[in-house]
């Protein structure tokens, strides 16, 4: 149990996909203007990541891995396209569910919801799962943790950006300029966790 808790904490803080690996920055910067929208997208990323990482773990370990189906048959060269297909299918299911049950959130997320399909944070989480050779339970924990870490980063950024609306930001830095500086300072803050070994 301690190992899984350590993996969860590590994936949220120490190996944060947004602020340590800078994955998913396009949606991170575009949707972080309001906390409510950022929270909705963060929950969507958690759901997709929690399902995509273990689903791709099963597909990789029981279909694509070298010698799993037939001795001497290595289908691992299909892993990228398979992972993207699974992620795309999960995002489509999530999009239909949000459209039916949460139309306000669906409209608020707009074009950024389908962009989760090509969000490199989701694909990065799946790739790290394969690279680190996680088992199924570890992949579930890592999926939840990496999604929660990305959500923590985007909600914190949205909160800071909402407060900056009332700040006296120099003319040349308004908009994305100060947002990039803020993201860099947040990344420095999260870098302080890198010395912790769990």
Curated annotation (Swiss-Prot):
A single cellular component GO annotation: Gram-negative-bacterium-type cell wall
Catalytic activity reported: a ubiquinone + n Na(+)(in) + NADH + H(+) = a ubiquinol + n Na(+)(out) + NAD(+)
Pfam family, one: Rnf-Nqr
Keyword flag Ion transport: yes
Biological processes annotated in GO: respiratory electron transport chain; sodium ion transport
Database matches in InterPro entries: NqrDE/RnfAE (IPR003667), NqrDE/RnfAE_oxidrdctase (IPR050133), NqrE (IPR010967)
GO MF annotation: an example: oxidoreductase activity, acting on NAD(P)H, quinone or similar compound as acceptor
NCBIfam families: nqrE (TIGR01940)
Subunit note: Composed of six subunits; NqrA, NqrB, NqrC, NqrD, NqrE and NqrF.
Protein name: Na(+)-translocating NADH-quinone reductase subunit E
Gene it is expressed from: nqrE
């Amino acid at each position: 149990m301690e190992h899984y808790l350590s993996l969860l904490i590590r994936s949220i803080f120490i190996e944060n996909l947004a602020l340590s690996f800078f994955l998913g920055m396009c949606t991170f910067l575009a949707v972080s203007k309001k906390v409510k929208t950022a929270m909705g997208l963060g929950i969507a990323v958690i759901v997709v990541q929690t399902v995509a990482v273990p689903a791709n773990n099963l597909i990789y370990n029981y279909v694509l891995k070298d010698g799993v189906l037939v001795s001497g048959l290595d289908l691992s060269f299909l892993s990228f396209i398979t992972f993207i297909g699974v992620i795309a299918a999960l995002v489509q299911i999530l999009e239909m569910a949000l459209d039916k049950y949460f139309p306000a959130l669906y409209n608020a997320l707009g074009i950024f919801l389908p962009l989760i399909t090509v969000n490199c944070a989701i694909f990065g989480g799946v790739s790290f799962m394969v690279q680190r050779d996680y088992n199924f339970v570890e992949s579930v924990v890592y999926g939840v943790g990496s999604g929660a870490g990305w959500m923590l980063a985007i909600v914190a950024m949205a909160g800071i950006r909402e407060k900056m609306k009332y700040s006296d930001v120099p003319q040349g830095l308004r908009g994305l300029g100060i947002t990039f500086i803020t993201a860099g300072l947040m990344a420095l803050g999260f870098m302080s966790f890198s010395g912790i070994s769990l």
